[in-house]
């Protein structure tokens, strides 16, 4: 959108907000799982290697959690590599205590104090260099599984994370689940308790499959309830836009979605991103390996489907 039109379309009463992605190229990891798979298949399966290169060519977020032995060093490595490319990295903080309600991606920091230390190490790795951080996918919409005491703690921890990451110079988006999870007034209340006023905005559809327009409509509704805050949408696997209720884990019959872009068609949507790594398993469901492990067959299925229907292109 032209800058003037973008300003005119901002929610009434909201302060026009800078898009941290504007004019920036996003970081592409040359050693991503898809890039390594393409190299492994280059001679034996050249057509499939080419499909892996389609995935590898796209900028994708780097996730940090309790598997990172030294989160400061790992974040520093990603942010430094991006700086050498002249690019903007997108990182995901995924280490909240009682993560994923004990399901496929269970884990996280042992307690609140451990999380505070971890998020400070994460922020130290950024060290006031350009970076975007998605804060705790599903952490807000799923907190009903916790007793009230731990719900209150989670809000405190998320507010602290937002404040700490902003102080390190990052652009911060607090995760707000997906359009079919929580109604906008409910989600807005959760975001306010989690410090959305300090953040750049919120993220939608992380690791999910809901259509772009469904997310944009929901995001615009939610934005109006949180002071006009902007949002980003994960389009990594929503090319078919046919999310089925309770089929969020390695859902079959999906496709790669829109390639990352700031050309979203909405003044409130800062970017479409690939937050989820296509081919990274959601868990031991629908034939997949453990959560977070690379699953080449699923990545190939997503790429083949996108090739057939053109779902990575604007539409």
Where are these regions (language model features)?
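N-terminal carbohydrate-binding/catalytic regions of secreted carbohydrate-active enzymes
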Residues: 20-125, 277-309
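A general structural signal for short secondary-structure junctions and capping/turn motifs
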Residues: 17-18, 81, 262-265
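Surface-exposed substrate-engagement region within the catalytic domains
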Residues: 23, 29-55, 180-299
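Secretory targeting and sorting signals
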Residues: 1-16
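Acidic/glycine-enriched edge-of-secondary-structure segments
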Residues: 57-66, 148, 169-182
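Substrate-binding cleft of extracellular glycoside hydrolase catalytic domains
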Residues: 67-70, 77-172, 186-191, 198
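Structural recognition of the beta-strand scaffold that forms the well-ordered cores
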Residues: 25-28, 61-65, 88-93, 131-136, ...
């Amino acid at each position: 959108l032209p800058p003037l039109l973008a300003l005119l379309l901002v929610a009434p009463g909201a302060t026009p907000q800078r898009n941290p992605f504007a004019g920036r190229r996003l970081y592409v990891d040359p050693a991503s799982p898809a890039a390594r798979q393409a190299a492994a298949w280059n001679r034996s399966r050249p057509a499939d290697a080419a499909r892996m290169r389609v995935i590898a060519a796209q900028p994708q977020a780097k996730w940090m959690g309790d598997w990172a032995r030294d989160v400061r060093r790992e974040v520093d490595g990603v942010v430094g590599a991006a700086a050498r490319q002249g690019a903007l990295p997108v990182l995901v903080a995924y280490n909240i205590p009682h993560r994923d309600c004990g399901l496929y991606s269970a884990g996280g920091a042992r307690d609140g104090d451990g999380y505070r230390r971890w998020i400070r190490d994460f922020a130290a790795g950024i060290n006031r260099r350009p970076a975007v951080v998605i804060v705790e996918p599903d952490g807000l919409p799923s907190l009903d599984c916790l007793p009230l005491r731990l719900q209150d703690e989670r809000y405190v921890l998320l507010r602290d994370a937002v404040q700490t990451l902003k102080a390190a110079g990052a652009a911060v988006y607090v995760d707000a689940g997906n359009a079919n999870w929580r109604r906008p007034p409910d989600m807005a209340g959760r975001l306010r308790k989690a410090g959305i006023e300090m953040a750049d905005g919120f993220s939608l559809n992380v690791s999910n499959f809901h259509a772009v327009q469904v997310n944009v409509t929901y995001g615009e509704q939610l934005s109006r309830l949180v002071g006009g805050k902007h949002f980003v949408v994960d389009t990594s696997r929503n090319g078919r836009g046919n999310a089925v209720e309770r089929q969020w884990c390695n859902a079959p019959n999906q496709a790669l979605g829109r390639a990352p872009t700031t050309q979203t068609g909405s003044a409130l949507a800062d970017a479409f991103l690939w937050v989820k790594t296509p081919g990274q398993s959601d868990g031991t469901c629908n034939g997949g390996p453990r959560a977070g492990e690379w699953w080449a067959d699923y990545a190939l299925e997503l790429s083949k489907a996108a090739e057939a229907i053109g779902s990575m292109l604007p539409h």
